[in-house]
């Protein structure tokens, strides 16, 4: 596959430059309808954790945020931490996101924000690594970090529960942790021999390790 994010994979299928691609988001019904003999295979799941700096008092006082609180934080309606919880200090909330046109933000927008825009004061990080670095360096920062990156930085960032549910491989796979996106192989028509071999590889132990290395939780 060529890189270029999830949108590029679907676009290549739609305009016929590819008959097989990898996308890291749900495929819209309107897109499926335009692809001849549309097929999809789920090979992994990524979740977005709501991450703060471990020195932020919220990590000790309140390890959970509701979807509504997250929405108010990221929209800028809550400007200081004490608006989230009166026992927290009145320090300014620093919101960190990925670029607003990317796949990760699309998932966050859909699962949490709905029609509400993220504050224009948000720092847009060019990568998940850069997003996490901002949280590590700023005690008042909050951002959505993909599960794999959050695991790699355990101890340096703190992942809050969302609506009382912690992000774990179990809650992500069973769907009870809601801020998540699938890693899909999408195609048009029957798999060719080469495509089938690639699918078999992804479902093998080596392939599952590769999916984990990409920061996803493998799904057989």
Predicted regions and their residues:
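Exported/periplasmic ABC-transporter solute-binding proteins
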Residues: 1-220
């Amino acid at each position: 596959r060529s890189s270029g994010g999830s949108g590029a994979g679907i676009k290549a299928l739609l305009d016929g430059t590819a008959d097989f691609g990898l996308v890291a988001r749900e495929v819209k019904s309107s897109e499926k309808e335009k692809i001849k003999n549309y097929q999809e295979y789920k090979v992994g799941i990524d979740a977005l954790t709501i991450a703060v700096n471990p020195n932020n008092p919220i990590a000790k006082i309140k390890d959970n945020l509701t979807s509504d609180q997250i929405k108010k934080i990221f929209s800028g309606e809550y400007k200081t931490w004490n608006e989230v919880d009166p026992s927290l200090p009145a320090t300014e909330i620093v919101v960190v996101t990925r670029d607003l046109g990317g796949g990760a933000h699309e998932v966050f927008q859909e699962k949490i924000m709905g029609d509400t825009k993220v504050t224009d004061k948000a720092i847009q990080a060019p990568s998940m690594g850069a997003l996490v670095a901002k949280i590590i360096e700023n005690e008042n920062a909050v951002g959505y970090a993909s599960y794999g990156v959050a695991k790699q930085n355990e101890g340096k960032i703190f992942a809050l529960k969302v609506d009382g549910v912690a992000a774990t491989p179990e809650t992500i796979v069973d769907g009870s942790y809601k801020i998540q996106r699938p890693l899909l192989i999408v195609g048009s028509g029957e798999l060719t021999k080469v495509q089938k071999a690639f699918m078999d590889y992804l479902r093998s132990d080596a392939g599952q390790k590769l999916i984990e290395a990409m920061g996803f939780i493998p799904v057989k």
